[in-house]
């Protein structure tokens, strides 16, 4: 009996941005991912980039992230450019958040965004 090959699990890191000012998904937000290197001196290594789709979701990256290594990663969401494109003044030029990633797990980062504030949490 032949076994079925494993199915791709998709990216290990996804996100979803909702514009809480308008109540709609934040489409077209540029997102970058960096890995923190802690020794000998702290620095960040660029890993990947993407853009939120029409539903405000990050579902793919410009590189394969299905097997990211454990470590501390930083998401950088270019929120200022997003609000500029809407003609809305905002306080934050970008939102950056550091998260601890364990290899083999999926991480979903929801971002509830407004011009003068934001909320985030680990989603499922």
Swiss-Prot record:
Organism domain of life: Eukaryota
Keywords: Hydrolase, Purine metabolism
UniProt binding sites for substrate: 16, 57, 121
InterPro entries registered for this protein in UniProt: Hydroxyisourate_hydrolase, Thyroxine_BS, Transthyretin/HIU_hydrolase, Transthyretin/HIU_hydrolase_d, Transthyretin/HIU_hydrolase_sf, Transthyretin_CS
Gene Ontology MF, one: hydroxyisourate hydrolase activity
Database matches in SUPFAM superfamilies: Transthyretin (synonym: prealbumin) (SSF49472)
GO cellular component entries: cytosol; nucleus
Any Pfam family the entry gives: Transthyretin
EC number: 3.5.2.17
EC class name: hydrolase
CDD domains named among the record's database cross-references: TLP_HIUase (cd05822)
Family from the record: Belongs to the transthyretin family. 5-hydroxyisourate hydrolase subfamily.
Reported function: Catalyzes the hydrolysis of 5-hydroxyisourate (HIU) to 2-oxo-4-hydroxy-4-carboxy-5-ureidoimidazoline (OHCU).
Miscellaneous note of the record: HIU hydrolysis also occurs spontaneously, but more slowly.
Name of the protein in its database record: Probable 5-hydroxyisourate hydrolase
Species annotation: Schizosaccharomyces pombe (strain 972 / ATCC 24843)
């Amino acid at each position: 009996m032949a076994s079925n090959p494993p199915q791709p699990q998709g990216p290990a890191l996804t996100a979803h941005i909702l514009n809480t000012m308008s109540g709609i998904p934040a489409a077209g937000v540029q997102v970058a991912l960096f890995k923190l290197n802690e020794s000998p001196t702290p620095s960040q290594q660029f890993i990947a980039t993407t853009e939120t789709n029409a539903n405000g979701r990050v579902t793919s990256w410009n590189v394969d992230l299905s097997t990211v290594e454990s470590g501390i990663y930083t998401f950088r969401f270019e929120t200022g450019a997003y609000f500029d494109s809407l003609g809305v003044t905002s306080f934050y030029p970008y939102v950056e958040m550091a998260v601890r990633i364990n290899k083999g797990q999926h991480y979903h980062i929801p971002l509830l965004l407004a011009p003068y504030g934001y909320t985030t949490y680990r989603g499922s």
